[in-house]
Regions:
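Conserved beta-loop-beta/alpha segment of the NTase-like Rossmann-fold superfamily
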Residues: 2-77, 115-116
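Active-site neighborhood of HAD-like aspartate-dependent phosphohydrolases
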Residues: 187-232
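Conserved Lys-Pro-Asp/Glu-containing loop-to-beta segment of HAD-superfamily phosphomonoesterases
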Residues: 31, 287-289, 295-325
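Residue-level signal for inorganic ion chemistry
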Residues: 22, 37, 51, 74, ...
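A short, conserved beta-strand element in the Rossmann-like catalytic core
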Residues: 12-13, 38-41, 158, 198, ...
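Catalytic-core segments of class I nucleotidyltransferases/pyrophosphorylases
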Residues: 30-32, 39, 45-52, 63-68, ...
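Acidic, Mg2+-coordinating phosphoryl-transfer loop and its flanking beta/alpha structural elements
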Residues: 319-342
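Substrate-recognition element of Asp-dependent hydrolases with the DxDx(T/V) motif
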Residues: 218, 222-258, 268-282, 331
Length: 342
């Protein structure tokens, strides 16, 4: 009702100093903080619902990108709680999840009151330097591991357009309708990929991370999916969990290796689902509670239905690609167009 209000800095205050200068205008409700040089089309109602349901004080919009090796990485646990924020300069693990901060944030104003930053000092010269506030270094990174900053993973369109080259690329995407189509309020199209024998070289039951090897050309194929407007989602049976041959942590590391190797070649996946179950009993070291006839193990279509719900996917406009009969049966059962590869 008050229209657009502006705060003009007389001198540069850093990329977050202005927040403290307008603290009295922010009230008590969460606010949206955006990078001004980004093009985005996001279902913010969905993101805000996530923020409130998880009782977060800060929610970061995160997504995979085509160059995670030189991007800042967000490390989170299985509950999406941010544990680490690795800048481009920080040492990083050998294998990592391709998850990057996109520069869209939902922030509870109370966060500003929790920080040891004196609003009166911002903009003043102290010890020969003007006091500024850096959003990432002084506000967000210190919240890592505290339990109330979460990451919101989404494949929606968010791209920096701060250089002429990036601006023209974004302009081209906008003209093609790609920007608006990626909003999760709209039905999405996906290419579902099996893992073993489709993405990585088939080794039977893959138990050793050192045996994971991308098939030649698969990164280029996935890049084509990334550039097509389709989501790229992996759906894989992993009975090695139920058989007690691989732990959840070991499987997670294998998938981090997959994402790292794809990222080095400029490719990424938008989602990953795996079935840890196995219906047959009698294996030494097996996990009894996982030895069940579930709804997610292919050839049943359960994992595709999970993705349908999470990403608002139109299954009839999507593809299932795999090297086995179970992949084709699952895709057909979900209403996808299925492709068997040799």
């Amino acid at each position: 009702k008050d229209g657009v209000q502006y705060f003009e800095e007389k001198i540069p205050l850093g990329n977050a100093g202005a927040l403290f200068k307008i603290r009295n205008l922010l009230g008590k409700e969460p606010f949206l903080l955006l990078n001004a040089d980004a093009m985005f089309e996001v279902d913010f109602n969905r993101m805000l619902k996530f923020h409130k349901e998880h009782k977060a004080l800060v929610t970061l919009f995160t997504h995979p990108n085509s160059h995670p090796y030189d991007s800042g990485l967000i490390v989170a646990n299985e509950k999406s709680i941010v544990e680490e924020w690795l800048t481009k300069e920080d040492a990083r693990p050998q294998w990592y999840k391709n998850r990057v901060n996109a520069g869209l944030h939902i922030i509870d104003p109370s966060v500003l009151d929790m920080l040891s930053i004196n609003e009166d000092d911002i903009g003043r010269e102290i010890n020969g330097k003007v006091v500024k506030v850096d959003l990432d270094r002084q506000i967000l990174k210190p919240l890592c591991g505290k339990g109330f900053m979460l990451c919101y993973d989404s494949p929606e369109y968010v791209k920096d357009m701060g250089t002429p080259e990036r601006y023209y690329a974004v302009e081209n995407d906008y003209k093609k309708g790609i920007v608006s189509a990626k909003n999760l309020a709209n039905k999405q199209k996906a290419v579902f990929l099996d893992r073993d024998g489709t993405i990585n070289v088939y080794k039977g039951f893959l138990r050793d991370i050192d045996e994971f090897e991308l098939i030649d050309g698969v990164a280029d194929a996935i890049k084509k999916i990334n550039n097509s407007g389709y989501l790229c989602i992996v759906v894989t049976n992993q009975p090695v969990i139920a058989r007690g041959e691989v732990t959840y942590e070991q499987l997670d590391m294998i998938h981090k290796k997959m994402e790292t190797l794809l990222g080095l070649d400029g490719a990424y996946i938008d989602g990953l689902y795996y079935c840890p179950h196995h219906p047959h009993k009698g294996y030494e070291g097996e996990i009894p509670e996982l030895k069940i006839d579930c709804k997610c193990r292919k050839p049943k279509p359960g994992m595709l239905y999970m993705a349908e719900k999470d990403f608002n996917i139109s299954l009839s406009d999507s593809f299932m690609v795999g090297d086995g009969e179970n992949d084709i049966i699952a895709g057909n059962a979900a209403g996808c167009r299925s492709v068997l590869i040799a």
